[in-house]
Amino acid sequence: MSNISTPRISGLTEYTSQPDKSHYDSIESHFLLPDGTPDYLKLILTSKVYDVCNETPVTPAVNLSSKLGANIFLKREDLQPVFSFKLRGAYNMMAHLPQETRWKGVIACSAGNHAQGVAYSAKHLNIPATIVMPVVTPAIKYKNVDRLGAKVVLHGNDFDAAKAECNRLSEKHGLTNIPLFDNPYVIAGQGTIGVELLRQIDVESLKAIFVCIGGGGLIAGVGAYIKRIAPQVKIIGVETYDANAMRQSLQKGERITLSEVGLFADGAAVKILGEETFRLCQQVVDEIVLVSTDEICAAIKDVFTETRSIVEPAGALSVAGLVKYVESHPEIDHSASGYTAILSGANMDFDRLRFVSERAKLGEGSEVFIVATIPEKPGSFGKLIDLVHPRAVTEFSYRYSNGELEKSDGKAHVYISFSVDNAKAEVPRILDDFKGAGFDAIDISHNEFPKSHPRYLVGANQPVTNERVFRFEFPERPGALVKFLHGVKSKWNITLFHYRNQGSDIAKVLAGISVPSHESDQFQQFLDNLEYPYAEETDNVVYKLFSQGD
């Protein structure tokens, strides 16, 4: 019988909207340091995680090691029973609950790996568990939790609403709230990964451990142990450019709250860090590396090449950061260095693989996108292809621009992508070759607009009066698209529209809207009230070329 109940919920950004302010009341005095803070060395070494968790192996990354000229290892947390490290922290906290509170049950707010970790732990410990998720949570996620025996409550339109309901149910029924990351026992559970690493890898050669950062529980736990036992080993965190709460917080010396977070690496999409995790990270984190979506996709491919396993975007963050770190520091002799990346999880949505495959080549620098303007006359296409040859062309799109066909002054805009061995080294030479042939060319490999909506632009009509173009990100839930269209249709004409689902909780929409200049303020108010992330692309060079014929 199903344990799913469904009142109502929105976006799937998992974060602590109201940081847990509980301190160390549940920690026994002999596990506290003289200053009253937890002794994480003791907490980690006495952790109870191995009742349910595996000591995961370390896999040598042979191909990456050869490519980067270093000794690379992958810590395989994707091989845990719930395919994520989250089981360690959830189980350790729940295993330390006193018997008099266990019978009441536990509760958590999560639609991701933490939910499965709590549900799995509760089943093993015979503790009733309730998991609160947003109403728009994909069925595959809540059904997995339901299958593990937890009661699933779907509530609210976003994680703020779901968390508020979680807190309400916790207080009403006396349920123990199992936080995502901000609890000493959760942190200590994650820290057992550090214990294993120092047993599995030669400490003398281990130079750095790369760890993905969401709320900070994993890096805080691993760092707390490593810095006590092998302080010379660097702890390097990895975040995305659009979800970098730790980087900004460490720079400012206090926790900051992000107004928006990127959702591709949704397992690490956190707006505000935990209080305790941030306190620890200030002490143990040596450096933060920021990576892009394309670099994460390339890292997923790298992991697949090494292991034939597919990790989720957040699970590949550490590898993306490791690769970027090594490539960004040519002054370091990496040949004698051992670097380890923790693969944090493998709960990948299958539908995302198409997107990952498309972007991986860009991320690893083996494919480039170029827009070229060539004369509209016989022989131009052939000349263009000769410049690219012998590289393999992966996509070729064309749009006639200005001038009349029977005249010789017409121009064609060409969108072309092709394979390269090393984008950084080859692209400048390629652009010089194009220029020498009399072709204007622009590298758009790092321009998000054409990467998300390129095919739609080719063949567009002439410029539209007062047209403004925007990229929107919509939560994949009933009513999101309707809300947008209803808000626009009564006021302004939609001149262009392209929707694309990436196989995740978020869909990308490209929209052109005719907005007279005297209505700009009213339109801005509409955008603000919409409450969806957006970026204006009206001045984007690719839009101008393909849609306006400039």
Curated annotation (Swiss-Prot):
Q: List the disulfide bonds.
A: none
Q: Name one GO biological process term.
A: L-serine catabolic process
| Cofactor(s) required, per the database record | pyridoxal 5'-phosphate
Pinpoint the ACT-like domain residues: 368-446, 468-539
GO cellular-component term (any): mitochondrion
- Predominant localisation class: mitochondrion
Comp. bias regions, Polar residues: 1-19
Keywords in UniProt for this one?
Amino-acid biosynthesis, Branched-chain amino acid biosynthesis, Isoleucine biosynthesis, Lyase, Mitochondrion, Pyridoxal phosphate, Repeat, Transit peptide
Q: Name one GO molecular function term.
A: L-serine ammonia-lyase activity
Q: Which Gene3D superfamilies match?
A: 3.40.50.1100, Biosynthetic Threonine Deaminase, Domain 3 (3.40.1020.10)
Q: Which reaction does it catalyse?
A: L-threonine = 2-oxobutanoate + NH4(+)
Query: Record's family?
Result: Belongs to the serine/threonine dehydratase family.
Protein name in the entry: Threonine dehydratase, mitochondrial
Q: Which organism is it from?
A: Blastobotrys adeninivorans
Name the gene for this chain: ILV1
